[in-house]
Every structure is written in C-alpha cells, then in structure tokens.
Amino acid sequence: MSAFNAFRQRYLVRFWSPLPALVALGVASACYFALTGTFWAVTGEFTRWGGHVLSWFGYQPQDWSYFRLIGLQGTPLDRIDGVMIIGMFLGALCCALWAGNVSLRWPTSKRRLLQGLVGGIVAGFGARLAMGCNLAAFFTGIPMFSLHAWAFMFATVGGAWIGVKISLLPFLRTPLKVGATASALPSAESLARRARLQARLGLAVLALAALFAAWRFEVSLVLGMACLFGLLFGGLIERAQICFTSAARDLWTTGRTRAAFGILLGMAAACIGTFAAIRLGVAPKIFWMGPNAIIGGILFGIGIVLAGGCETGWMYRSMEGQVHFWVVGIGNVIGGTLVAIFWDQLGTRLALPYPKLNLLESFGPGNGLLLTFAGLALCLLLVQLNASRFTRPRKPNHEPDRQTDPVA
C-alpha cells in the first residue's frame, strides 16, 4: 500500500475517535467566539430560515417579538451563523465524499420518517424555548458561564431517558423485514470506481467552499472566518461521527462513556479559551435561568432520541445521503418556528420574568471558573459511576440446583 493510500485509509476513510475530536471542537469553539463575538450555534439560524419561509407567504415575521430578539436582518449569506452553517454542510459533505460514504439511503420503514419529523419538531421547539440546542445551551453554553446551560444539560439527559422509554413502546418499534433473496453486493471494481468519483467530487466541494469563503472575506473578515470555522466544525463532526444523542442515550442503555467524556472534556477546554476571551472584553451570551431552560431541555432530550439525532448528528448524516435526517432537519426548522410564533405567550411566562445568571458575575471571575470546572469534574464522576451499573456482575435469578453425593 502506498503512503497516500495508507494516509487516506487512516484519516479520510476510517472514522476518528470522538474524544479527541470533541476536545478539538471545544478549543475551536472558543477561538470562534473570540474572533467572531458569538458562539457556535445553529438552531437560532434555522429558526430564521423558518421566518424567511413565512415571509414568502405574506407574513411579517420581522415584527414578531422573538425575531426582534434574535434578529432577522439580511439573508443567511449576510449573517455569521448562516455563513458558518453553510460552511458546516460543505465541510461535512467534503469529508463524507473523501471517505466514499455518500449514498442515498432510505429508512427501512416509512414510520421512521414520521418519527423523525415529530422528533425533529419536538427537539427544535425545546431548543428554541431554551434559547439553544446541544451547542448554544450545552456544549458552548456552559463555557459561557450561563447557569441556564447547566439546567438545560441535566434536563436534556433526563429527557433522553424519557425518550428511550417512549422509543421502546411497541408501536414505535420498526418491524424486521427479511427478503426472500439475498441482495447483490457491488463488485470491488465498482466500489473502487465509486470511491475515485467521490474523491474528485470532494475536491470540487472543497474548491467551492474556498471560493465561498473568499467571497465572504470580501464582505468582512468575520464572515470569512465564520465560513472557515464552519468547514472545520462540519469536517470534525462527520469524521468523528459526533452526535450528542448517542452520548445521552447511552447513559441509559449501554453505559458507554467515551462520547460523554469527550463532551465534558471538550467543554472544559472551551472554558479556558472562552474565559480568556471574556476577560479581554468579548461579551458572553447569557440567557434566562427560568422554567424555559428546564422544559426546553426535557423536550429536546425526548425529541433527539425519537428523531435519532441531535443538531450536529442530523447535519452530517444528511450530507451522507441519509434521507431520514433530511426530514429531521425540516422538523427542527418547524419546531423552532413554532416557538417564534407563540413566543409572546411562552416567553412572558417561562423566560422573560427570570434573571440571566452569569457565574462569573455572581461568584467572581476566578470562583466562577473554578465552580464550572468542579461541576464538569462532578459530571465526569457521575458518568463513570453510572457506567459501573452496566459492568457490575448480576446476581443469578435463582440458585443453581445443589448436587448431592449419592449415598454409598
């Protein structure tokens, strides 16, 4: 095997370990915050997309209180979040093509499409009610030292437990279909031909992404950097298959810890860079510590388990050609838009009356940072203790029959 083929197999075809990738994402998210002044987030922009769609039908969403809160000016090409998300899609698609992992894949049951849509709507609704998803109210929210992100994280884990219980209900179980004849496998030659084609397409996507970044750099340095960071984020989540759903779901089903450890360590790494940026004058993003964070987290946890993927999960899987996650993404946009429609009723009761609690202001910069690290360390311990439930030897349900020696 040539050196190039060995490199390709190791880094472009094989999936990467999620733990170092999540730490890298934490470092990158802190740099992104320092350079752009905003955090790595996606659902707010998806909700803006829903607002643009509503405007096509004669509505005036720019006058709604929710869109006045998060902003609806311009187009996705003019906004930092919009450019970054386009970069994420391009980065994920590029890496998936280089791995030869792009193909149109339909779910085995149409029921899964409906489940993905409903789960996506529930997750999108919960995320925007809490002002963030597994990124802005979790992975990049906790490093902002916003107390609401802690409430959202624990509520999401609890919601994932509810989602697991719901997913195991009989009417949601997908029946196993066994065909009468074996499906034909593609030949080695056709697989090699497909890999070469996708590798070339990956280079074309990379060239397109570079042109897009250069175009945005002409407008502003921040937009160009947003595109480059989006490419990095998208590439990392596709190569390491980063999905927070599996981390939360595994706590209740298998006890696997690698993804959860990676998320917690990634947040710890992000805390250092984010803290430095805040001390240098970049304003943190702090949101209300109200029932909206808890209710939104529970709904988000339920939704991502039902849908089978969180925001990062459905984004990279949709670029791999998995149709189910196209539907999940549409559901996310619908769910976030529903929050915007009903925000006057929801926000005035669940969010706006409550304080925005910044740990750095409440406890002081040093103590706030130490408290955050202590909380993350405690979470690492809880994850490990939870995993021990699945490795502890189980007692037999009944005692084995005692063998008696025959009487001589």
Predicted feature residues:
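Membrane-interfacial helix-loop segments of redox and metal-homeostasis proteins
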Residues: 1-408
